[in-house]
Amino acid sequence: MKYRAEIDGLRALAVLPVILFHAGFESFSGGFVGVDVFFVISGYLITTIIITEMAEDRFSIINFYKRRARRILPALFFVMAVCLPFAWLWLTPSYLKDFGQSLVAVSIFSSNILFWLESGYFDTASELKPLLHTWSLAVEEQYYIIFPLFLIATWQFGHIWILALLSFIFLVSLGIAQW
């Protein structure tokens, strides 16, 4: 896929509310909107790449996963390694145990589920979770793992199934969100 400057512009606009929220500006309490925009951009780009490669009969799920791993894992493991000594020095034993659980969850791209089960993102306890920010990466990685498999399956059955299955997933997700 060729470079698209307008997507970088959208990324810049999306990161502003996130930065301002984390900097403590109360008027920007909706920093999560920027994260949502990042999810949409990422979904669009990945879907476009996969469908283009599938249409040209050159898509490889193994190569796709390798590219994702080369792009994400080095920085992720670096962040985990940097957090480890600070957690060991400053966290109490119970919070250090929680940190160990979060290391495992981050490693298997499920930190969003762990943090959701433990506490809210905006809880005061969130200040003692050095890897809390990885929840969004976990969501993105889950998308990278599941969605290509979905596209491959629907590609095999015809393009009409893509629309039908996406519509079904959309309706189910709306139902779950209301539940």
For every predicted segment, state its role.
Residues 1-179:
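Membrane-interface helix/loop caps of multi-pass membrane proteins
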